[in-house]
């Protein structure tokens, strides 16, 4: 098969993101015309980490495209936990702010416990990222409301591409709270048989070879190789590794695409969908505030 023939196997996250953004734009216009409300997203950025600043810019551009009012709240790199919590409290009380996003990671002087405390301080009804334990708990019992954006984007892509999940073997590689755990829950909610693998899993290949659907998010360049997947597998690559010569995913895309029925590229796959689902969540937060 020629390289051109493989193009039909690529899940185009940019096209899907445009579809979601169009839906959000329509919803934003309806909310403004019928209720006089413009959805507002507050983004908290502590310090001046270049990668974090870049991600915030990407999110703001998406807000501009769909008509969401986005505002940055910047704290210096040496900000204290008390200062951060005070800011979050004020945003929780601000009726013009419908959704709050705390850009991670926080500077190194914030302990993991402090980061978690800050995430939990955000009102569950303004939790744009879907990370609050209340929203995670709802997800675990099958009540999907505000869920983490990357898994939400994967589910939307599965639906758009007509991939049946029920009864399928799904393997999640990586068990973070951001992708792995919520992804497993969302697939379980759709009656997939789910295995979650991680750094301590023996013989990862044994699991991936039996998978109909693979979602990988480890940050390990080309962890998933062609000999680790069976013909016809659907693969979502939510990992990213930046090197001097380019950006790479967790999947050896050039070789895996020859066996997969569908696969996301890096970049241009899961990333755009994640940001689009964030926009959808901001609109949802605004609608729930009525």
Curated annotation (Swiss-Prot):
For this record, an example GO cellular component is:
cytosol
Name any one GO molecular function: methenyltetrahydrofolate cyclohydrolase activity
State the InterPro entries in the record.
Answer: Aminoacid_DH-like_N_sf (IPR046346), NAD(P)-bd_dom_sf (IPR036291), THF_DH/CycHdrlase (IPR000672), THF_DH/CycHdrlase_cat_dom (IPR020630), THF_DH/CycHdrlase_CS (IPR020867), THF_DH/CycHdrlase_NAD-bd_dom (IPR020631)
Task: Please give the family membership noted in the entry.
Answer: Belongs to the tetrahydrofolate dehydrogenase/cyclohydrolase family.
Which function does this protein serve? Catalyzes the oxidation of 5,10-methylenetetrahydrofolate to 5,10-methenyltetrahydrofolate and then the hydrolysis of 5,10-methenyltetrahydrofolate to 10-formyltetrahydrofolate.
- Could you give the subunit structure recorded for this chain? Homodimer.
Query: This chain belongs to which protein, by name?
Result: Bifunctional protein FolD
Which organism's genome codes for this protein? Answer: Methanosarcina acetivorans (strain ATCC 35395 / DSM 2834 / JCM 12185 / C2A)
The organism's lineage? Archaea, Methanobacteriati, Methanobacteriota, Stenosarchaea group, Methanomicrobia
Gene name of the record: folD
């Amino acid at each position: 098969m020629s390289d051109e023939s493989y193009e039909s196997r690529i899940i185009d996250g940019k096209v899907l993101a445009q579809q979601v953004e169009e839906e959000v734009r329509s919803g934003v216009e309806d909310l403004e015309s019928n209720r006089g409300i413009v959805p507002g997203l507050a983004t908290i950025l502590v310090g001046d980490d270049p990668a974090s600043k870049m991600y915030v810019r990407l999110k703001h551009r998406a807000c501009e495209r769909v008509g969401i009012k986005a505002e940055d709240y910047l704290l210096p790199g040496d900000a204290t936990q008390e200062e951060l919590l005070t800011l979050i409290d004020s945003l929780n009380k601000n009726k013009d702010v419908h959704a709050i996003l705390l850009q991670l990671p926080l500077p190194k002087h914030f302990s993991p416990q402090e980061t978690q405390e800050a995430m939990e301080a955000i009102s569950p009804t303004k939790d744009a990222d879907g990370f609050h334990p209340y929203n995670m708990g709802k997800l675990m019992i099958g009540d999907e409301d505000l869920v983490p954006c990357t898994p939400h984007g994967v589910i939307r892509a599965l639906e758009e591409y007509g991939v049946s999940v029920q009864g399928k073997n799904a393997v999640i590689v990586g068990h973070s709270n951001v992708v792995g755990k919520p992804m497993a829950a969302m697939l379980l909610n759709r009656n997939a048989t789910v295995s979650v693998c991680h750094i301590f899993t023996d013989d990862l290949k044994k699991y991936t070879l039996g998978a109909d659907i693979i979602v990988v998010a480890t940050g390990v360049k080309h962890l998933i190789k062609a000999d680790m997947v069976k013909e016809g597998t659907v693969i979502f690559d939510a990992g990213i590794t930046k090197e001097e010569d380019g950006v790479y995913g967790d999947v050896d895309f050039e070789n895996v695409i020859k066996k997969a029925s569908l696969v996301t590229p890096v970049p241009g796959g899961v990333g755009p969908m994640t940001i689009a689902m964030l926009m959808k969540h901001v609109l949802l937060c605004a609608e729930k505030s009525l």
